[in-house]
Curated annotation (Swiss-Prot):
Sequence similarity: Belongs to the cyclin family.
InterPro entries cross-referenced by the UniProt entry: Cyclin-like_dom (IPR013763), Cyclin-like_sf (IPR036915), Cyclin_CLN (IPR014399), Cyclin_N (IPR006671), Cyclins_cyclin-box (IPR048258)
Gene3D superfamilies: Cyclin-like
Annotated stretches, region: Disordered: 224-265
Keyword tags: Cell cycle, Cell division, Cyclin
Xref: Pfam families: Cyclin_N (PF00134)
Function of the protein: Essential for the control of the cell cycle at the G1/S (start) transition. Interacts with the CDC28 protein kinase to form MPF.
Name the record gives this protein: G1/S-specific cyclin CLN1
Organism per entry: Saccharomyces cerevisiae (strain ATCC 204508 / S288c) (Baker's yeast)
Note: Present with 319 molecules/cell in log phase SD medium.
Length: 546
């Protein structure tokens, strides 16, 4: 046998054929009509299961090594890159992150085992769903082998791939992933078939993006073939007379062709809008995995926030495809919080996510539009805060002006006769009517407070201190006639009894300390007791007797 006659094995030359669009549409329509009968029961079951499997953010915050505020962005980014490299289908990444959050709610995750945990979560999610999130596909035997479409072929990552991408055989081996899978299943009580966010966001026909892209290509081919046919038609009619050309322009077939072109353009625009909508929904679903604060909300609340963003920036009227809980409508505060979290997530989109979605139709313009909206919103908030601050300053200034004017009109002094405060002296402007003056002024000055002059009183203080203004009795009663001397002595004894020495009424009273004869305390004539703003330390009673 010659070498050329040796068979090299089976050579597959068959090509995948496109899945018939008519067949997929008929299957989807049948499924939609059948499922409507159980729509309420399905919606209620999804709400119960999603609430049951919701991660506990309070327990996740207690992770000693994997603090979510510091490590979530890095670990979710690694998990997303791992899902892209292993080519799992749409929705598996979100499901894997959900497994990781639920596991962190019950177990402590060590930092050197984080990649092992998230890799196992991705492997478990791919096997749970089979990568087939479409009614046409089957979990065991998905479409895609013979046909191209209606969605990508299901793929489960191999253990060798997970070992390679998670650090190599020096860190992990295949048996460690198998052991971790069993450990995660035991931790989650084998309750791994939980509702997905795709059940709220994506309709059954929106899961087969390939079908829409194929239909778009067919329309483009038909349009190109139509243009070629029109060019041939023009070349054939170039030999006609002018009258024949004019009749051809004014004839009905030409107008019918214009209507056909308009219909085709509208159909293309509608198809592009549908493809853009599907891409936006997938982008927001993947983006939500990075937003740790979204774990505080229910699944349907997150979906409402996503639809509010889609409707705002695409001018559409979209809503969840499952029923909302009865009597528990989302309040405006919750919707505002979710909206703000997602907007901030879009503005700060992870580079790895943008790198994958930048080729998708409508994603980059959407991100730029959201960034412009956020920038304008920040400017408005800054302007509003500035205006509010200006108003507060104006109100405060008017308030102080009114107080100043009312105080200057109602009373000439800020101090009343019953106050116990001693004002500081104004050195810059000498006043005859001051605390330190020796002349008696009947009327108070509008600048200096009204103080009482007094005679020399016998001090019975134990520490031989000077008599202060606050300890002196008022010579008048409520501004009326002067009181009698007996009454004054009674008042003095009553007020000065705390300064008396017990059982020593006949004790010798030391001499009073005199002010210095220089500086601002210099007095002429008879010495009178004046209250000063500075407390003078005087000699004690024992030293005065020596």
């Amino acid at each position: 046998m010659n070498h050329s006659e040796v068979k090299t094995g089976l050579i597959v030359t068959a090509k995948q054929t496109y899945y018939p669009i008519e067949l997929s549409n008929a299957e989807l329509l049948t499924h939609y009509e059948t499922i409507q009968e159980y729509h309420e029961e399905i919606s209620q079951n999804v709400l119960v299961q999603s609430s049951k499997t919701k991660p506990d953010i309070k327990l996740i915050d207690q992770q000693p090594e994997m603090n979510p505020h510091q490590t979530r962005e890095a670990i979710v980014t690694f998990l997303y890159q791992l899902s892209v490299m292993t080519r799992v289908s749409n929705g598996i990444f979100f499901h894997a992150v959900r497994f990781y959050d639920r596991y962190c709610s019950k177990r402590v995750v060590l930092k050197d085992q984080a990649k092992l945990v998230v890799g196992t979560c991705l492997w478990l999610a791919a096997k749970t769903w089979g990568g087939c999130n479409h009614i046409i596909n089957n979990v065991s035997i998905p479409t895609g082998g013979r046909f191209y479409g209606p969605n990508p072929r299901a793929r489960i990552p191999r253990l060798s791939e997970l070992v390679h991408y998670c650090g190599g055989s020096d860190l992990f081996d295949e048996s460690m992933f198998i052991q971790m899978e069993r450990h995660i299943l035991d931790t989650l009580n084998w309750d791994v078939y939980e509702p997905m966010i795709n059940d709220y966001i994506l309709n059954v026909d929106e899961n087969c993006l390939i079908q829409y892209e194929l239909y778009k290509n067919q329309l483009q081919n038909n349009n190109s073939n139509g243009k070629e046919w029109s060019c041939k038609r023009k070349s054939q009619s170039s030999d006609d007379s002018d009258a024949t050309v004019e009749e051809h322009i004014s004839s009905s077939p030409q107008s019918t062709g214009l209507d056909g072109d308009t219909t085709t353009m509208d159909e293309d625009e509608e198809l592009n809008s549908k493809i853009k909508l599907i891409n936006l929904k997938r982008f927001l679903i993947d983006l939500s995995c990075w937003q740790y604060n979204l774990l505080k909300f229910e699944l349907y609340e997150i979906c409402n926030g996503m639809f509010s963003i889609i409707n705002k920036f695409t001018n559409q009227d979209q809503g969840p495809f499952l029923s909302m809980p009865i009597g528990n409508d989302i309040n405006s505060n919750t919707q505002t919080q979710v909206f703000s979290i997602i907007i901030n997530g879009i503005v700060n989109s992870p580079p790895s996510l943008v790198e994958v979605y930048k080729e998708q139709y409508g994603i980059v313009p959407f991100i730029l539009q959201v960034k412009d909206y956020n920038l304008e919103l920040q400017k408005k908030l800054q302007l509003a805060s500035t205006i509010d601050l200006t108003r507060k300053i104006a109100v405060n200034s008017r308030y102080f002006d009114q107080n100043a004017s009312s105080s200057s009109v109602s009373s000439p002094s800020t101090y009343s006769s019953g106050t116990n405060y001693t004002p500081m002296r104004n050195f810059s402007a000498q006043s005859d009517n001051s605390v330190f003056s020796t002349t008696n002024i009947d009327h108070s000055s509008p600048i200096t407070p009204h103080m009482y002059t007094f005679n020399q009183f016998k001090n019975e203080s134990a520490c031989d201190s000077a008599i202060s203004v606050s300890s002196l009795p008022n010579q008048t009663q409520n501004g009326n006639m002067p009181l009698s001397s007996n009454y004054q002595n009674m008042m003095l004894e009553e007020r000065n009894k705390e300064n008396r020495i017990p059982n020593s009424s006949s004790a010798e009273i030391p001499q009073r300390a005199k002010f210095m004869t220089t500086g601002i305390f210099q007095n002429t004539g008879e010495l009178t007791n004046r209250a000063s703003s500075i407390s003078l330390s005087l000699r004690n009673h024992n030293s005065s007797q020596l």
